Amino acid sequence: PEYSARGMMRRYHVETVCTTDDPVDSLEYHIKTRESGFEIKMLPTWRPDKAMAVEVPADFRAYMEKLSAVSGVTISSFDDMVTALRKRHDFFAEQGCKLSDHGIEEFYAEDYTDAEINAIFNKVYGGTELTKEEILKFKSAMLIVFGEMDWEKGWTQQFHYGAIRNNNTKMFKLLGPDTGFDSIGEFTTAKAMAKFLDRLNTEGKLAKTILYNLNPCANEVIATMLGNFQDGSIAGKIQFGSGWWFLSLIHISEPTRLRRIS
């Protein structure tokens, strides 16, 4: 039908659709769509936010159990978790995935040791709440792990940062997350962003990267950050993402206007 989902995509000459998918997702509808012979590309995007969400131990443990079940890897250590995530990363690649996407409040680039991360994993996996410092160290380690995975496969990594979420406690308890009570955050993240990108770049493992800020105050930060890590291997290896969410304004988001900007 003309106004079905597929009909609308054909009507507007869509060539590729990339969905947002968790590492534990089956991707069954991507497989079915491909097998149906649908001419428009339908590709998954790797969104592993829950694998670094260690604020609530019970939620993290429950997610690890899902990851273990879908990957076939028994998880009892940090290395086990990374092995399970790599297996899912491989599966996503087999289904045509070429992009990762990370929804983060800010960039995380704390110093840490392998021993510290192993201990932090054991602590949260065992049900004990982490300190703020431990949370930041774990998130920092996970961003590096994910960045290295993407580089190994030649993927492009995307970072959407700057939202402050679930601000209305009453409505959060009533409706849960992602129900319209998020807003633009204000974070000092330039140094952490630079440190994160620099670590991967120094290791020779910086993947193609797109940076999306939510607070327009960071426009100049990103615009100047891009030039620090271009290496001539491809044009625009590090790019400024288009406006999203509160910045999805028609006067800057139309393709013709984006072409003028570029």
Question: Could you say what each language-model-derived stretch is?
Answer:
Residues 169, 222-223:
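Short, well-ordered secondary-structure micro-motifs
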Residues 250-262:
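Single conserved hydrophobic/aromatic residue that forms the stacking wall/gate
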Residues 192-212:
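Electropositive, surface-exposed helix/loop patches at the edges of structured domains
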Residues 209-219, 229-232, 243-247:
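Extended C-terminal subregions enriched in glycine
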Residues 56, 184-194, 215-222, 246-249:
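A general structural motif
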Residues 204-206, 229-238:
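Glycine-enriched alpha-helix->loop->beta-strand junction motifs that scaffold or abut catalytic
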Residues 1-184, 199, 228, 239:
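Extended, charged catalytic domains and RNA/DNA-binding interfaces, predominantly
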